[in-house]
Amino acid sequence: MTQSNRKIATLLAVTALLLAGAAHAETLRLSTLKQPGSEGAQAAEKFSKLVGERTEGRIEIKVYPACQLGDWTEVYEQVMQGAVDMAMQPLATADDKRLAITWFPYAFTNYATAKQSLSPGGAVFGIVSEAIADKGLTPLGVYGEGMGGAGFAKAVESPANTELKRKLKVRVWPGGTTHKVLLERFGFNTATLPWAELYTGMQTGVVDGQIGGTAGMALESFKDITKTWVQFNDHFEGDWFIINSDKYASLSEADQKILLDAAQEVSAERFEQVEAADAKHLDTMRQAGIEVVTFDDATLDKLAGVARTEVWPQIAGELGEETLGQLKSSLGIN
């Protein structure tokens, strides 16, 4: 064989190897609610990029934003079944009360404790891992949206005073027993109202306020009818990176670690950003003429103390005694 032929043969062999590698590259579909170009969609794309780079192209994560693969509750079922590989979205909590831990009031009160508890080794991450394992799902990380609060169409008298009885009716979501009991202990009246009716309900005075989201969410949906925003820090809103467990198990241990590390890197980066993002949303509210009420750490601890000692015993059934015990143990509460 001439030198020229040897070069050609070598080139063909290398090309064949590359093509073989490409042929065995695996594409995983990841669904998210986030709109194209949003911070959440960018986080999903960064996760995809990290996985692609670190697996040297063995795994490609294709991101489908804006519920392109279906409503998020449908996608949740599809990930369980393996029809969709991955998602970055809320957890569907209806069929397992342990997952109420993701919005349980005052499971944490600040960004540092939320990050610790929502990362591998943390109490809430562990509880969620155990709960969704039964459904064929594995959690990889959490994309933080921010701390929760309540928006009102009216002024709120002394919102830190949990002994004051107010003539304000706050909407809680259907099934939102946890926050119904919390708000009533904090001196508010409550009413259940479907999401589709909430804007009109606040506008017409059927209810005076709403709870269950972040300042950013309130700006998106209720900016023009919100007069007061109270940053209760009652829960931490986040989307979960989840993957079908069988699909995850089919990957090599090295690639499993790459996916987990990439999700955790994106999650950690977001935890560094989310406090500033919340602060920015609060500033936007102030600029729009909305009265913004925030609390110092001592006041938040006092609110959390009331919730944990007086509200938690009433809503323990929403979580289950064993799961509540795990949460209390992680917080050093007897």
Where are these regions (language model features)?
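Hinge/lid segment of periplasmic solute-binding proteins
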Residues: S119-G136
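Sec/Tat signal peptide C-region and signal peptidase I cleavage site
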Residues: L19-A25
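Bacterial N-terminal signal peptides that target proteins for export
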Residues: T2-L12
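N-terminal secretory/targeting leader peptides
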Residues: L12-V14, E26-K115, I132-A133, T138-N334
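Hydrophobic alpha-helical segments with strong N-terminal bias
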Residues: N5, A94, V128-S129
